[in-house]
């Protein structure tokens, strides 16, 4: 998981958005005390949570509590729920929603690792290649914007 958590840059040509997301979800699944410090890549990933709050009509945290990938039935219900909200949330808000889901279920036992893995698998069903391309470009731009502000 240490590939991207401290990274400050992200390349559109050579870096994998899937790898970033997987590392980020694993990092989010840790308790606050256990999480290593982060660089600009994960700081930019955190901004997708803002999109989720901004684009969702209701309480995004209530919606996040209903997402469960720990059982087959929960996985299917979660997939249906997210798919029905994806147009309103946008791909960016959906990424933020899934980040919030992992963040509110964080911990340090094996069930948290399984939960994070379930969310990663859920993402594989939710995001197509076009969505991943949009997330990749958005992440790159958010990092660049952050670099411009920091200078």
UniProtKB/Swiss-Prot annotation:
GO terms for cellular component: host cell cytoplasm; host cell nucleus; nucleus. It comes from the Viruses. InterPro entries: Poxvirus_Bcl-2-like (IPR022819), Poxvirus_sf (IPR043018). Induction: Expressed in the early phase of the viral replicative cycle. It holds the Pfam family Poxv_Bcl-2-like. One of its GO terms (molecular function) is protein sequestering activity. GO terms for biological process: symbiont-mediated suppression of host cytoplasmic pattern recognition receptor signaling pathway via inhibition of TBK1 activity; symbiont-mediated suppression of host toll-like receptor signaling pathway; symbiont-mediated suppression of host type I interferon-mediated signaling pathway. Belongs to the orthopoxvirus OPG029 family. Prevents establishment of cellular antiviral state by blocking virus-induced phosphorylation and activation of interferon regulatory factors 3/IRF3 and 7/IRF7, transcription factors critical for the induction of interferons alpha and beta. This blockage is produced through the inhibition of host TBK1, by binding host TBK1 adapter proteins TBKBP1 and AZI2, thereby producing a strong inhibition of the phosphorylation and activation of IRF3 and IRF7. Also acts as an inhibitor of the cellular response to type I IFN by interacting with host STAT2. Interacts with host TANK, TBKBP1 and AZI2; these interactions prevent interferon production. Interacts with host STAT2. This is IFN signaling evasion protein OPG029. It comes from Vaccinia virus (strain Western Reserve). The lineage of its organism: Viruses, Varidnaviria, Bamfordvirae, Nucleocytoviricota, Pokkesviricetes.
């Amino acid at each position: 998981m240490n590939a991207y958590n401290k990274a400050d840059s992200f390349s559109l040509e050579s870096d994998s958005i899937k790898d970033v997301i997987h590392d980020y979800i694993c990092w989010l699944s840790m308790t606050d005390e256990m999480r290593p410090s982060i660089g600009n890549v994960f700081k930019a990933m955190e901004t997708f949570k803002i999109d989720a709050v901004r684009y969702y009509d209701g309480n995004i945290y209530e919606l996040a509590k209903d997402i469960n990938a720990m059982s087959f039935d929960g996985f299917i219900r979660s997939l249906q729920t997210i798919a029905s909200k994806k147009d309103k949330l946008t791909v960016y808000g959906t990424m933020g929603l899934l980040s919030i889901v992992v963040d509110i279920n964080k911990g340090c036992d094996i069930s948290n690792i399984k939960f994070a893995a379930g969310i990663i698998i859920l993402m594989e069903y939710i995001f197509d290649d076009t969505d991943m391309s949009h997330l990749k470009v958005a992440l790159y731009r958010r990092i660049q914007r952050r670099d411009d502000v920091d200078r």
